[in-house]
Every structure is written in structure tokens, then in C-alpha cells.
């Protein structure tokens, strides 16, 4: 037990330093190309912080543990929205740009609709469905690239106020992004692998590990990025990262794992005799995303009450999971 605990601590240190470098690089990239931080967060940062989910879910699906891949995607969305976004919103509520949020939010709910059809109507995730998810990922990236082309003109006036002398070189920006992403991925893997060993030693069921511990572990890059962004005053970067990561969890993470190894909806965890994901996790996933995004789209701001409500939902879900 000592070795897993030590590796767990090493992973945590990797995450902290990697998050610091990654946020610095992402913020510098946004300033260099005069792009909104929320947009950079929803694309570049989200890709980097979603790498652990991609790796964990792909390895799980290929090794025959579709339950882990399925639970990890849903659990990561819940964790991102009801824990990480909740912390960000509760600590620093504020204004957001609804226009920048529209594309990722629309793609998330479109992907969630496909996910619901597979889970409720089909009862399985087939390879053709995986191709559809990957196609949605490509469409999402194209939509964001088109949005980025419009962003510089809108941000030109603001960009003129930046101090050019303090601008980070492009080479250093890319080095910080890459090294930060690598440290985050390594740290997350160390935490997930060794944390899972510790949880298994304590007798925690695999389905519960997937929806809570593994989901939290693979969401640690988002958590580290969110906290680091808050400390550095880049809250838009944090929110964009969370929403973008949720889209990637449903279209990229699930798309890759389903394409490589199709699987049926797991039935090991039940609630009232019904698959718990159908009556609990998926409805909660949709609910927390609506609570997080709809007020922002309508009013252009996030309130502390939203963060508190989301944290309460996450705490209640964890309590239910560990008592099933």
C-alpha cells in the first residue's frame, strides 16, 4: 500500500506544476492571437486536459472493461460540471460571453441526445455510433475554427491595450503548453492507477470506482486548470475548458473507445432494479449541464448560488453511489 500512496503523491505534484505551465501557455496563446480566453479554453486547453479521459477510456474498452469507459465519460461530465465548474463559479461568479458559449453548449446537448438514444433505446454503443461521435468531434473543431476567425476583429481594440513588451514568445508558449499537458497527463494517470488500487483494496465496486474515483481522477487536469486559472485571474479560460472538455468526453472520449471496442450498457449497478445510469447518472449529467450553462446563455453571468447548488448535487450523487 505504501508504493501506491507514494506514486499518488508524485502524480499530484506533476498535476500542480503541469497545470501552472499549461495555463500560462494557454493565456499567452490567447493574447498572442487576440482570441477570447473562453474560446481557447473550449478548444486548445480542453484537448490537453481531456487526454487522460481518452487514454483511460480507450485502454478500458480495448481490455474488455466497457463499464469503465462508459462510466468514465458520464462521470467526468458530472465531475467537471458539478464539482470543478461549481468551485469556479462559487469562488468567482461573474459575467460570461453568451456568444462564445453557444457553439460548445449546442454541440454538448446534440452529443448528449445521441448518447441517450444509445443508452435508452439501443442498450449498446456500436461502432457506427462511434464514427458518428468522431464526426461530431470534427464538426465541433471546424465550428470553433470558424468562430476563431471572427474573434480577432472583435477583440482588436482590447488587444491594443496589451503590453507588447510582456508578450511571451511563441516558442516558449508552445513549450509550456506541451510540457504542461504531458505533466498533467502523467500525473492524472499516476493518480488514477494508484488511486484505483487503493480503492479496490478497500473493497469499492468497479462501477462506483468508474463513476466517482476514476472520473474524478481523469478530471483532475480540468480541476488543476480551473484552480490555477482562478489564481491567475483567468476565469473565462476555466469555464471554456470545462464546457469544451464535456463536449470532448461525449464525442471524442466515447467516440474513440466505442469505435475501437463497442460495448453494451453495463448492468452491474442498479437502482430500484433498473440500470442506475439510466435513472440516475445520465439525468444528473444533463441536469448539471443545464444548471451551469442555461443561465449563462440567457443572462450572460454566473451566480454563486449556481455553484453551491451544483456542489450539493455532486455530494448527493457520491453519497448515493457509495450506498448502492
Where are these regions (language model features)?
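Hydrophobic alpha-helical segments, chiefly the membrane-spanning helices
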Residues: 1-324
